[in-house]
Amino acid sequence: MGIFKAAAIQMRSGKEPGRNAVEFEALVREAAGRGAAYVQTPEMTGAIIRDKADRATAFRPEDSDQIVASARRLSAELGIFLHVGSTAILRDDGKIANRAFLFAPDGALAARYDKIHMFDVDLDNGESWRESATYEPGGEALVADIGMAKLGFAICYDLRFPALFRAEALAGAEVLTVPAAFTRQTGQAHWHVLLRARAIENGAFVIAAAQGGQHEDGRETFGHSLIVDPWGKILAEADHDEPGVIVAEIDTAQSAEARKKIPNLRNAREFSVASVSAFEPAALRGAAS
């Protein structure tokens, strides 16, 4: 559909939304200054906070959120598509959403996406996470047409659920977006391979803006923001823990070409799953007949 420059912004968001908004604006301006027509920020751009009491004072409804207001203004001023990877939003029902926003070059809100899969895990290093205790999961995938490309939306832990990305690719997505705040431990093990796999298996670009470094609340995120092409080649990569901007050219014709070379979207078949037991020979004989 088009050729354009895309930017992924790496941040180290702290507990104070106001300070994060200042860094957010500076980095967005840098990205636009480098020619990016689409700019993506990481998950939890607004604030990274573990303490429940601090969250209660920091999280705001959409209409009074600082990052949302800044993004609306900046997208119009700079004439860019600005994708806030996510920020915590207090919903009308009192629940909290981990919500992404896409603003158009005229400042209009083009799309929202709420993170679907909650990160509820216990890691080997003692870290324990229960996102479902704080956030209300979304229930709808999203593909947004921005003229230059069709974007498929995801946030962080969604990356581990390939069916989401396949559904978006089948719906026309040529660029898969994965703003994230991966832990250092899981990022070292899985970040690069998962992002490249999602690109390869769907014949799509992947843009993944990340949080990186040691945060005020004690957590450490992996960084390494990436832009990957449909063949799995890394086009741009950020450092582990330094805030900054990476930029790469996106040519959606490369997505069409990758899908022509490896037409797995077209070749996919529905199938059933048989279940047998090696300890029940009769069942095995039945499956073979």
Regions found by a protein language model. Name each.
Residues 3-15, 40, 99, 112-114, ...:
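Active-site-proximal beta-strand elements of phosphoester/diester hydrolases
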Residues 17-18, 25-106, 112-114, 183-198:
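Cys-nucleophile CN-hydrolase/nitrilase-fold catalytic domain and related Cys-dependent amidase chemistry
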Residues 19-28, 160-166:
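Short, acidic/polar
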Residues 42, 116-119, 179, 210:
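Conserved residues at the C-terminal ends of beta-strands
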Residues 62-83, 150, 156-245:
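CN hydrolase (nitrilase-like) catalytic-core segments centered on the catalytic cysteine
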Residues 84, 99-102, 142-144, 225-227, ...:
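Short beta-strand scaffold segments in enzyme catalytic cores
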Residues 91-171, 184-193, 261-264:
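Active-site catalytic loop in hydrolytic enzyme cores
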Residues 112, 210-289:
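C-terminal beta-strand edge segments of enzyme domains
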